[in-house]
Curated annotation (Swiss-Prot):
Protein name as catalogued: Inclusion membrane protein A
Coiled coil: 172-233
Quaternary structure annotation from Swiss-Prot or TrEMBL: Forms homooligomers.
Function: Chlamydia replicate within an intracellular vacuole, termed an inclusion. IncA is probably involved in the homotypic fusion of inclusions.
Domain remark from Swiss-Prot or TrEMBL: IncA proteins share the same general organization: a short N-terminal domain, a large bilobed hydrophobic domain, and a C-terminal cytoplasmic domain.
Classification lineage: Bacteria, Pseudomonadati, Chlamydiota, Chlamydiia, Chlamydiales
Membrane topology: Multi-pass membrane protein
One GO cellular component, as annotated: pathogen-containing vacuole membrane
Effect the entry attributes to changing A62T: In strain: H/UW-4
Keyword tags: Coiled coil, Host membrane, Membrane, Secreted, Transmembrane, Transmembrane helix, Virulence
Localisation: Secreted; Host vacuole, Host pathogen-containing vacuole, Host pathogen-containing vacuole membrane
Ranges for region Disordered: 1-20, 254-273
Family in the record: Belongs to the IncA family.
Effect of S261F: In strain: I/UW-12
Length: 273
């Protein structure tokens, strides 16, 4: 039988360190740069439109205003480029931290799965050993059933040879019960042969192995009980046959004595006459 195994609960995943997964908070300078970049984005549209107008009529009307607008446009572009340069590294760092955390979780899950696989492989090894032992026991029991079946076949042949005597000595009900018992024994032995193949196919099904083994034990016990009953019945039949033969021989001897006694009584009477 399989030995009870303990289910090992997987350990809790490692808690992420605060310093590794903590996203750095933006400083005051970063906030100022962000506000300046947003303001510059608002100004870009206005200054761009005004720059187009300034290029058209700036040198004719007010070249100083055109120079100031161009300077503001260049400053806004420089601020946007600086903001994008600063924030690109921050977003990349955040994405890398998320990927590292997911990789740690995946690594932990893989280690837990490896431990479970090793535990299941050990359980399967012990189950296969127990199954081989049960199969050997079952085949030995089946061989014993076949030997007993051969003995019952020889006994049945003896009963067939003495059919006439059995009909005279015993009733038809006892013979019918004996035939029914032998037929049921044959059917159960035929049923055991596909069960042996079923046991081989069920080697990979661990959950149903215990149920199949219990059923086989029940069938084996029932067959043993029936074999014991049949052996007891055969003993009783043998004793009854011997008793009936003895009674018949006694009856025959009595009949012979009664038949011979009138002859003896008749012989003295003839002499006296």
């Amino acid at each position: 039988m399989t030995t009870p195994t303990l289910i090992v609960t997987p350990p809790s995943p490692p808690a992420p360190s605060y310093s590794a997964n903590r996203v750095p908070q933006p400083s005051l300078m970063d906030k100022i740069k962000k506000i300046a970049a947003i303001a510059s984005l608002i100004l870009i549209g206005t200054i761009g439109f005004l720059a187009l107008l300034g290029h058209l009529v700036g040198f004719l009307i007010a070249p100083q205003i055109t120079i100031v607008l161009l300077a503001l446009f260049i400053i806004s572009l420089a601020g946007n480029a600086l903001y994008l340069q600063k924030t690109a590294n921050l977003h990349l760092y955040q994405d890398l931290q998320r990927e590292v955390g997911s990789l740690k979780e995946i690594n932990f899950m893989l280690s837990v799965l490896q431990k479970e696989f090793l535990h299941l492989s050990k359980e399967f090894a012990t189950t296969s050993k127990d199954l081989s032992a049960v199969s050997q026991d079952f085949y030995s029991c089946l061989q014993g059933f076949r030997d007993n079946y051969k003995g019952f076949e020889s006994l049945l042949d003896e009963y067939k040879n003495s059919t006439e005597e059995m009909r005279k000595l015993f009733s038809q009900e006892i013979i019918a019960d004996l035939k029914g018992s032998v037929a049921s024994l044959r059917e159960e032995i035929r049923f055991l042969t596909p069960l042996a193949e079923e046991v081989r196919r069920l080697a990979h099904n661990q959950q149903s192995l215990t149920v199949v083994i219990e059923e086989l034990k029940t069938i084996r016990d029932s067959l043993r009980d029936e074999i014991g009953q049949l052996s007891q019945l055969s003993k009783t039949l043998t004793s009854q046959i011997a008793l009936q033969r003895k009674e018949s021989s006694d009856l025959c001897s009595q009949i012979r004595e009664t038949l011979s006694s009138p002859r003896k009584s008749a012989s003295p009477s003839t002499k006296s006459s």
